[in-house]
């Protein structure tokens, strides 16, 4: 039976996102467990002036960090320009 990941697992994912300085915010964090597999998907908000390559590299970096925390997970990170979508949780910077 499919179920949402526990709050503790979601907190780990949120901490990974919060710690990445290139992530300005994120939304649509969706998690699922089916049998022994985990599925994690999130939309991140990044600097709209970055190149496609830079955006891809950021997404890859975050996917790898989440996969290190959850080795059995299928992870999808979708980058979007900051300010163009609803943000459920904003990452604050020290600027």
Predicted feature descriptions by range:
Residues 1-95:
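Alpha-helical transmembrane segments and adjacent TM-loop junctions that form the membrane-embedded core
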């Amino acid at each position: 039976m499919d179920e949402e990941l526990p709050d503790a697992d979601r907190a780990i994912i949120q901490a990974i996102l919060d710690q990445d300085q290139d992530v300005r915010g994120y939304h649509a964090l969706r998690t699922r467990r089916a049998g022994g597999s985990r599925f994690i998907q999130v939309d991140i908000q990044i600097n709209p002036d970055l190149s496609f390559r830079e955006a891809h590299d950021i997404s890859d970096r975050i996917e790898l960090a989440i996969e290190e925390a959850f080795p059995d997970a299928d992870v999808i990170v979708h980058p979007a320009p900051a300010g163009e979508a609803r943000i459920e949780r904003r990452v604050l910077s020290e600027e």
